[in-house]
Amino acid sequence: MNFKFHHLNLCTDNLPRLTKFYQTLFDLGTIRDEEHTRVNAESTKTGYNGKVDFLSDGAIEFHWAERDINTGFKMKQFVNPMSRGHFCFRTNDIKGFMRKLDELGIPYSDYGKWAIAGWYQVFLQDPDGNVIEIHQPGM
């Protein structure tokens, strides 16, 4: 099982303002590809239908998203990745990672494939309450 830093997510109440700020200051480019296709983005079925801007500096991804303080509640999960934001690691063995969390007694929210096409996503909190996403693509 390996891990690689994938992205930083910030949640905002004013997505155009936040995106413009970072694009202007850091010259971030917009990501538009199949991998970043939202699942049912216009539907309430996913528990989150806010807008998301996918940006990159060429090496690191940034996912700026409209804040939704009720995503966890709507998904019946205790971790809400769309309230304060999160950072993300990508793995090649999400099931193995979930077994490790179980063995260590670390609670997590199994969101499955809910927001990005083909990404299986799990969210947890570190001891200080910071939200961490682990996902495996191609699922």
Regions found by a protein language model. Give the residues of each.
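Hydrophobic side chains in well-ordered alpha-helices
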Residues: 18-21, 97-101
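A short, acidic/glycine-rich surface segment
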Residues: 38-42, 70-75, 110
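Core segments of cupin and vicinal oxygen chelate
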Residues: 11-60
